[in-house]
Amino acid sequence: MTHQVAVLHQDKKFDVSLRPKGLEEFYGQHHLKERLDLFLCAALQRGEVPGHCLFFGPPGLGKTSLAHIVAYTVGKGLVLASGPQLIKPSDLLGLLTSLQEGDVFFIDEIHRMGKVAEEYLYSAMEDFKVDITIDSGPGARSVRVDLAPFTLVGATTRSGMLSEPLRTRFAFSARLSYYSDQDLKEILVRSSHLLGIEADSSALLEIAKRSRGTPRLANHLLRWVRDFAQIREGNCINGDVAEKALAMLLIDDWGLNEIDIKLLTTIIDYYQGGPVGIKTLSVAVGEDIKTLEDVYEPFLILKGFIKKTPRGRMVTQLAYDHLKRHAKNLLSLGEGQ
């Protein structure tokens, strides 16, 4: 096993160890939890398999965790799949026919399924039936196979890329939003307890403030602060130690990292504050378009550092102030919109 593979395996085990089992352990997203709890409990009281669920929103907010929670709540098995792996009907068939009654079938990145596979999924979702082609050529025939009733849970960072026929087949649909600092702090309290990490309240709040509203990142930063404190601070984890540990990762007090700063300074230094197209930015900062749109832009827009216009991305006055730059082009560009 290579070092890189070993680290990835360790990270996966780390994430799984902190995954909440039930909704009572899932902090934040309060309105979503209330709706989902009602939706699942109502189906269970009627003795029915819950309807299909779609969770969408930025990466790292808990979509996969919610799929596990749905399976845990209904007390059934969970079958995992990824959209990019489901291109042809044959890619789906084995998974669908292996499902037991009430199982939860989770498809991550469901927007990346192949079109033919997606259309094959429609009858499975609606009628719990699929058609199988037997033989080939002139003697080919289609046989309809019954499936055990199941709950499909789809997750996507790009709900706009889902086709209307697929989207409308989900009985429950909810967007996950970025978490507040307080919600992230509660998550970190739970995580530190599970990991046996002793950290004071100020340290956990400092980590929460720099976690971009994202639990996955918060938990990874907690682990980094633990390692930093172990080597540099005699295992003492307070607010000052957390601040030093995160500064070592080049994460500032707004949660902006090296790529965020590079993105903002590139727009300011080379494009006079914008507007500039996403393709041009992708080349300039050395990140692919999907990463910029899914990982970096949503947080920068949420915090008010950039805005999207018909002509491209522009930095805001807040970005100039944060970077201590003079906004030479901001007024004229704003008047031109």
UniProtKB/Swiss-Prot annotation:
Residues 180-250 are annotated as: Small ATPAse domain (RuvB-S). One of its GO terms (cellular component) is cytoplasm. It is found in: Cytoplasm. Keywords: ATP-binding, Cytoplasm, DNA damage, DNA recombination, DNA repair, DNA-binding, Hydrolase, Nucleotide-binding. ATP binds at L18, R19, G60, K63, T64, S65, E126, D127, F128, R169, Y179, R216. Residues 1-179 are annotated as: Large ATPase domain (RuvB-L). It comes from the Bacteria. It is an enzyme of class 3 (hydrolase). Residues 253-337 are annotated as: Head domain (RuvB-H). SUPFAM superfamilies: P-loop containing nucleoside triphosphate hydrolases, Winged helix' DNA-binding domain. GO terms for biological process: DNA recombination; DNA repair. It catalyses: ATP + H2O = ADP + phosphate + H(+). Gene3D superfamilies: 1.10.8.60, P-loop containing nucleotide triphosphate hydrolases (3.40.50.300), Winged helix-like DNA-binding domain superfamily/Winged helix DNA-binding domain (1.10.10.10). Mg(2+) binds at T64. The RuvA-RuvB-RuvC complex processes Holliday junction (HJ) DNA during genetic recombination and DNA repair, while the RuvA-RuvB complex plays an important role in the rescue of blocked DNA replication forks via replication fork reversal (RFR). RuvA specifically binds to HJ cruciform DNA, conferring on it an open structure. The RuvB hexamer acts as an ATP-dependent pump, pulling dsDNA into and through the RuvAB complex. RuvB forms 2 homohexamers on either side of HJ DNA bound by 1 or 2 RuvA tetramers; 4 subunits per hexamer contact DNA at a time. Homohexamer. Forms an RuvA(8)-RuvB(12)-Holliday junction (HJ) complex. HJ DNA is sandwiched between 2 RuvA tetramers; dsDNA enters through RuvA and exits via RuvB. An RuvB hexamer assembles on each DNA strand where it exits the tetramer. Each RuvB hexamer is contacted by two RuvA subunits (via domain III) on 2 adjacent RuvB subunits; this complex drives branch migration. In the full resolvosome a probable DNA-RuvA(4)-RuvB(12)-RuvC(2) complex forms which resolves the HJ. This is Holliday junction branch migration complex subunit RuvB. It comes from Chlamydia pneumoniae.
